[in-house]
A protein has these predicted regions:
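Class II aminoacyl-tRNA synthetase catalytic cores and aaRS-like
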Residues: 1-320
Length: 320
């Protein structure tokens, strides 16, 4: 029933064994989960599974699409040497001894950095390579000792050009292999990213932003907020967590310890139970330090809803 021909029944009249074979360690269909360690130890069998086979075919097509796209944009694919000399980079080199020159060694490239600079100096203004790279370092979630990277280099261009090349390449790949058409990518400069998200590479799938509230609290008697709000080198921000009211006091204390290790002085909060009753519908140790006008302004400015949680940060702008 799992075959394209449907569920069929055969009646055998004669069976001839042409060769004996051991029973496969696991079935080759995609209908059963198999432990990854078992799959890797029996890689030949694993690659015969339709899912794995299709992934390899798809990867091949992706590489071909990238090459066609860059070729159409007048980039030249140029291979660079694998056996090279050690250069200062971010990890240790893999070393390969030379058979011809005793006591001498080759280093496997961590990236084609040196060679692409030579190509630019040699007059090849637009270069790319789907390059194998080698880094002798501990495994990480996004890094293996041996990996492939798309290396692109161009001379006499501006930032917008290389961003456009990369964006359009991703759009073409997504359209061809996922069937989706992507909108233009959002662009953030470093200062806006640090101001709104607190890091230089935010995950924009998470719709949480730091909101500046210095103007709202600068006249408060609560010095924890008022003093940094009046300091040009400091700031006061709020972070709204939709439906975050379920966080326990213990969990909030753990977050407070975490931000304290990063240099923050603390982590004030307000739990929103009922926005229709501001006087009794909010829960926080700091409410007694804030006047009603400020609290009402916070509710309106941050568009607070029932069961939301509001965190506050106050201090030097380099920390908050």
């Amino acid at each position: 029933k799992n075959m394209t021909t449907g569920e069929i029944e055969l009646v055998a009249e004669e069976i001839v064994i042409l060769s004996k074979a051991a029973t496969p360690v696991f079935p080759l269909d995609d209908y059963q989960d198999v432990n990854e360690d078992v799959r890797l130890k029996n890689r030949v069998l694993d690659l015969r599974r339709p899912e794995m086979n299709q992934r390899i075919v798809t990867r091949s097509k992706i590489s071909s699409t990238i090459r066609n796209y860059l070729d159409d944009n007048d980039f030249h694919e140029i291979e660079t040497p694998i056996l090279t000399k050690a250069t200062p980079e971010g990890a240790r080199d893999f070393i390969l001894p030379s058979r011809v020159q005793s006591g001498k060694f080759f280093a496997l490239p961590q990236s084609p950095q040196l060679f692409k600079q030579l190509l630019m100096m040699g007059g090849l203004d637009k270069y790319y390579q789907i390059a194998r790279c080698f880094r002798d370092e501990d495994l990480r979630a996004d890094r293996q000792p041996e990996f492939t990277q798309i290396d692109i280099e161009a001379s006499f261009i501006d930032q917008e050009y290389i961003m456009e090349i990369g964006e359009n390449m991703i759009k073409e790949l997504v359209h061809m292999f996922c069937g989706d058409s992507l909108d233009s990518f959002p662009v953030l400069n470093w200062h806006d990213s640090m101001r709104d998200y607190g890091c230089d590479k935010p995950d924009l799938r998470i719709p949480l932003k730091l909101v500046e509230i210095s103007e709202l609290v600068k006249d408060e008697e609560f010095k924890v907020f008022a003093e940094p709000a009046k300091d040009n080198n400091s700031r006061v921000v709020a972070l709204k967590i939709p439906r975050g009211n379920s966080l326990s006091r213990g969990q909030i204390d753990e977050y407070t310890k975490f931000v304290s290790k990063l240099g923050a002085k603390g982590l004030a909060y307000i739990k929103v139970n009922n926005t229709d009753d501001i006087e009794n519908g909010l829960q926080s140790p700091i409410l007694k330090f804030l006047n009603k006008e400020t609290i009402n302004s916070l509710v309106a400015e941050l568009d607070l809803n029932n069961d939301d949680l509001l965190f506050f940060g106050a201090g030097k702008a380099s920390v908050v």
